From Swiss-Prot:
GO terms for cellular component: chloroplast; DNA-directed RNA polymerase complex; mitochondrion. This is DNA-directed RNA polymerase subunit beta. CDD domains: RNA_pol_B_RPB2. It is found in: Plastid, Chloroplast. GO terms for molecular function: DNA binding; DNA-directed RNA polymerase activity; ribonucleoside binding. It catalyses: RNA(n) + a ribonucleoside 5'-triphosphate = RNA(n+1) + diphosphate. InterPro entries: DNA-dir_RNA_pol_bsu_ext_1_sf, DNA-dir_RNA_pol_su2, DNA-dir_RNAP_su2_dom, DNA-dir_RNAP_su2_hyb_sf, RNA_pol_bsu_bac, RNA_pol_bsu_CS, RNA_pol_Rpb2_2, RNA_pol_Rpb2_2_sf. One of its GO terms (biological process) is DNA-templated transcription. DNA-dependent RNA polymerase catalyzes the transcription of DNA into RNA using the four ribonucleoside triphosphates as substrates. It holds the Pfam family RNA_pol_Rpb2_7.
Length: 1060
């Protein structure tokens, strides 16, 4: 079986390509810069550039919120042409953020990743559309490297038009003449000159009589705002720059595609659209009209290209050099004007390059914060491919045809793994064997079947459609198996059944077509694709548990997924372990002693805990590549996202209806689903107009128990247990004392009690809702240079221990997700015939309608593996060997477990896979046999502690005066129209009035409630309209509609007019 390529290899190879080739290409484009008098010339000598190794380590960059980058130095020379003197210096250009071996960059202490973008490849594309009369109109679209799309079309009268915008079109002879070709040259270089001669009349012939007339006509149509332009060299240059260079630049890939599609041989360095290209495009377009040639499929991957991290970084580097060029030009002119002697050091600043990359990593849509929920998430994030981003599509305008699966995706883009929601089909994931080729195409490996050579070849999408490719045959696992006579195959985007002798290529691996997430689902062939999609997404949301456990039933890729994620500590040299603890491992070998630091309670950006545990004892000899310590969610070097728990599929008093899950309290007391979460809180100190803010533990008017954990500096002590509302950092902000700002009662009390007006306002960092835990790290980052614009920052990290509770979300690996609805005592849970209580009870109705039967196979095989102490690794699509192959695998294992453990209930022939179980409350058996087994269940990041919320008081919206929405804003829950109907249905008049007035948007009633609460007494009823009604009246007035409303007195039924 061939080795699977590294899952992070695509990102890292792209960055290496940028360092090796992209930097040099862009530096060679840097022009020689002269002053206005052409006496001084500045130039870069790009042959001798160098990147300096960073002074800090990755871990320190994350901890101190710095950028892990390398300094770029280039030799530059300043030449005085009068004396022919040259001054050469090595200058600092700027910092380039580096990428680690996992494909991540660290910018301002945050792990970031640049995902690959799929764009339409530049070139020429032919398509046919029906007009309003039902007649086919053939068009040829020239897609440039920068996204411009000029079109050529031929109508039913065989007239050829050039269309640059949707509304305007012009005869093809005009742009051809404007590009420098006269009518005679055009007719000599086309295959159908009679068509070109048939449609121009005398007026049009005059327009193309000379290049000047053609340029004027073209400029009138597309670039002129008004009036009659006059031909000039500046107008010609402007048209050349705005249209023929910016909108018609093909680029390196576009020139290659154009030459292949039109069968021409223009040199690769001619990256702009030439008159010869236009004439060849028109020839093919006329041939399409006459039924010759084939139309292009725009959604085929051969017509797409990958814009990788190398391309994006190279574009940003080129942009930075353009900014540097403008800065150097301005500095030279300023130095000459002020009669100063410039040097290369004085001319060049590092600001353009540094700020360009900071802006790119911080603001570009394709640069994203690395999702580090668990190890699987980290490697999957780097293999995403997106149609979105600059130059791409948007979620609201993309059609269904673009989102759909295309036959060319086979083995390149996973047909299952995509995002859900508005971006479905637009954000995909690369297949595990796919790689990005030199020309930006996605290549897939195949095993070549011939007598001369039997080797693996990587083919781009434009080549494999010419071969007969065997799809899913027994040779995909073992080359020695006898070939079948007739096999399913793929040829020219069609799936056929042909003889084995006609096969050219075959697949190399059963997982070749899937992404990493889909490849970790056992028995995936028995699941509906929608549920497999949910499963591959939910595995990325699994929380690393405090006690991880390997899955009993897996697919075999768990080891490589854990290895490539980089969370485990790997021995880089062979040697002997001489010391080990929770902080480091010391290795002795080759006369050197190496100390390997371990990650201890590091926070991910999803607040999960990244921690490494040593696996090697002291005195053990190890080899290179051996695992020294397991990381988060890994055991023995294999991915371990969940737990193997005993599940039963049966209803239980309605507590597991509609995807609810019933669990045993053993999962809590045994710390089965306990996870650690780390939250970071920070506060800054600024210099205000009244003076600097102070960090202190002397906070007036605060209760002592809130300050109990502060040290003498006013910062919480390490190891303290913190509850909601406690002070983490004590801070006072100076303010001007104004007696007039206080209420009269407040001033009277201050005068009686002798309390002085405070000159400082308390602005402490307090622990918000749901943040209780243990302080594990406190860091005070001092400002450098004493600048008031660079404030001091204090960071406090708090560790939380979370057991599973009601409201948490759990899921299996087959899209079977649910919310914990009730936690039963273990004695009340249903129990097996040997007395073992089950851990979870799932609803059986969730299986048949969702068609994810793979969980049944996993459940039964997991029970057999648990009893036999075995682990299984199942390849997908085993049904291709024989029918019912999965069932024939599971049932013998259950039978073997039943015999070895002398438990006949494990496999009962009447209902294999099911068993009679008993009600824990009564001891009576249930009426029907129940499917029981060991399933691998994950605890997801959607936890009730992060979501539950109640509002007592909070902020209100300025316009509607209604409570804000959302937990972060202390918002409330909206009582809408249907909720009011429900309240009315129960006849709760007072509750309805409260919801619509006091607790919502009645300003005066809210104030009266506050007063009545303080003084005592009954709360008065609101008499006027709430603010939302007044807002409606004002909006109607803005539309010149007056709405009057009246309140009728209950006593005398008189109308009392109230203004809105």
């Amino acid at each position: 079986m061939p080795t699977i390529p590294g899952f992070s290899q695509i990102q890292f190879e792209g960055f290496c390509r940028f360092i090796d080739q992209g930097l040099t290409e862009e530096l060679h484009k840097f022009p020689k810069i002269e002053d206005t008098d052409q006496e001084i010339e500045f130039q870069l000598f790009v042959e001798t550039y160098q990147l300096v190794e960073p002074l800090i380590k990755e871990r320190d960059a994350v901890y101190e919120s710095l950028t892990y980058s390398s300094e770029l130095y280039v030799s530059a020379g300043l030449i005085w042409k009068t004396g022919r003197d040259m001054q050469e210096q090595t200058i600092f250009i700027g910092n380039i953020p580096l990428m680690n071996s996992l494909g991540n960059s660290i910018v301002s202490g945050i792990y970031r990743i640049v995902i690959n973008q799929i764009l339409q490849s530049p070139g020429i594309y032919y398509r046919s559309e029906l007009d309003h009369n039902g007649i086919s109109v053939y068009t040829g679209t020239i897609i440039s490297d920068w996204g411009g799309r000029p079109e050529l079309e031929i109508d039913r009268k065989a007239r050829i038009w050039a269309r640059v915008s949707r509304k305007q079109k012009i005869s093809i002879l005009v742009p051809s003449s404007a590009m420098g070709s006269n009518l005679r040259e055009i007719l000599d270089n086309v295959c159908y000159p009679e068509i070109f001669l048939s449609f121009p009349n005398d007026k049009e012939k005059k327009k193309i009589g000379s290049r000047e007339n053609a340029i004027l006509e073209f400029y009138k149509q597309f670039a002129c705002v008004g009036g009659d332009p006059v031909f000039s060299e500046s107008l010609c240059k402007e048209l050349q720059k705005k249209f023929f260079q910016q909108r018609c630049e093909l680029g390196r890939i576009g020139r290659r595609n154009m030459n292949r599609r039109l069968n021409i041989d223009i040199p690769q360095n001619n990256t702009f659209l030439l008159p010869r290209d236009v004439l060849a495009v028109v020839d093919h377009l006329i041939g399409m009209k006459f039924g010759m040639g084939t139309l292009d499929d725009m959604n085929h991957l051969k017509n797409k290209r990958i814009r990788s991290v190398a391309d994006l970084l190279q574009d940003q580097f080129g942009l930075a050099l353009v900014r540097l060029e403008n800065a150097v030009r301005g500095t030279i002119c300023g130095a000459i004007r002020h009669k100063l002697i410039p040097t290369p050091h004085n001319l060049v600043t590092s600001t353009p390059l540094t700020t360009t990359y900071e802006s790119f990593f911080g603001l570009h849509p394709l640069s994203q914060v690395l999702d580090r929920t668990n190890p699987l998430t980290q490697i999957v994030h780097g293999r995403k491919s997106s149609y979105l981003g600059p130059g791409g599509l948007t979620g609201r305008t993309a059609s269904f045809r673009i989102r759909d699966i295309h036959p060319s995706h086979y083995g390149r883009i996973c047909p299952i793994d995509t995002s859900e929601g508005i971006n479905v089909g637009l954000i995909g994931s690369l297949a595990i064997h796919a790689r990005i080729g030199h020309w930006g195409s996605i290549e897939s490996p195949f095993y070549e079947i011939s007598e001369k050579s039997k080797e693996i070849v990587y083919l781009p999408p434009s080549r494999d459609e010419y071969y007969m490719v065997a799809a899913g045959n027994s040779l995909a696992l073992n080359r020695g198996i006898q070939e079948e006579q007739v096999v399913p195959a793929r040829y020219r985007q069609e799936f056929l059944t042909i003889a084995w002798e006609q096969i050219h290529l075959r697949s190399i691996f059963p997982f070749q077509y899937f992404s990493i997430g889909a490849s970790l689902i056992p028995f995936i062939e028995h699941n509906d694709a929608n549920r497999a999609l949910m499963s591959s997404n939910m595995q990325r949301q699994a929380v690393p548990l405090s006690r991880s456990e390997k899955c009993i039933v897996g697919t075999g890729l768990e080891g490589q997924a854990a290895l490539d994620s980089g969370v485990s500590a790997i021995a880089e040299h062979e040697g002997k372990i001489i010391y080990t603890d929770t902080d480091k491992i010391v290795l002795s070998g080759n006369r050197d002693t190496i100390s390997i630091p371990l990650v201890m309670y590091q926070r991910s950006n999803k607040n999960t805990c990244m921690h490494q545990k040593p696996r090697v004892p002291r005195g053990k000899c190890i080899k290179k590549g051996q695992i020294l310590a397991d990381g988060a969610a890994t055991v023995g070097g294999e991915l371990a996202l969940g737990k193997n728990v005993l599940v039963a599929h049966m209803p239980w008093e309605g507590y597991n209806s509609e995807d609810a899950v019933l669990i045993s309290e053993r999962l809590i007391y045994g710390d089965i689903y306990t996870s650690f979460h780390i939250r970071k809180y920070e506060i800054q100190t600024h210099v205000t107009s009244q003076g600097p803010e102070r960090i202190t533990n002397e906070i007036p008017h605060l209760e002592a128990h809130l300050l109990r954990n502060l040290d003498k500096n006013g910062i919480v002590m390490l190891g303290s247990w913190i509850e909601r509302g406690d002070i983490l950092v004590g801070k006072l902000t100076p303010q001007a004392a104004k007696e007039s700002s206080y209420a009269p009662e407040d001033r009277l009390l201050r005068a009686i009690l002798g309390i002085q007006v405070s000159t400082a306002k308390e602005t402490c960092l307090k622990l918000p809702i749901g943040g209780r835990g243990r302080v594990i790290d406190v860091r005070w980052i001092q400002k450098k240079g004493g600048s008031s614009y660079n404030p001091e920052t204090i960071r406090v990290s708090i560790l939380q221990k979370r057991e599973i509770k009601v409201g948490d979300k759990v899921a299996g690996r087959h899209g079977n997700k649910g919310i914990v609805s009730k936690i039963l005592p273990r004695q009340d849970m249903p129990y097996l015939q040997d007395g073992t209580p089950v851990d979870m009870v799932f609803n059986p109705l969730g299986v048949p309608s969702r068609m994810n039967v793979g969980q049944m196979f996993e459940c039964s095989l997991g029970l057999a593996g648990y009893l036999l102490d075995k682990h299984y690794r199942i390849a997908p699509f085993d049904e291709r060997y024989e029918q019912e192959a999965s069932r024939k695998l599971v049932f013998p294992e259950l039978y073997s477990a039943s015999k070895q453990t002398v438990n006949p209930w494990v496999f009962e022939p009447e209902y294999p896979g099911k068993s009679r179980i008993f009600d824990g409350r009564t001891g009576d058996p249930f009426e029907q046999p129940v499917i029981i087994g060991k399933s691998y269940i994950l605890k997801l990041i959607h936890q009730v502690d992060d979501k539950i919320h109640g509002r007592s008081s909070g902020h209100y919206a300025l316009v509607t005066q209604q409570p804000l929405r959302g937990r972060a804003k202390q918002g409330g829950q909206r009582v809408g129209e249907m909720e009011v109907w429900a309240l009315e249905g129960f006849g709760v008049a007072h509750i309805s009035q409260e919801m619509l007035t006091y607790k919502s948007d009645h300003i005066r009633a809210r104030q009266e409630v506050l007063g009545a609460t303080i003084i005592g007494g009954t709360i008065p009823k609101p008499e006027d309209a709430p603010e939302s009604f007044r807002l409606l009246v004002r909006e109607l007035r803005s539309l010149a509609l007056e709405l009057n409303h009246f309140l009728v007195s209950e006593k005398n039924f008189q109308i009392n007019r109230k203004e809105a």
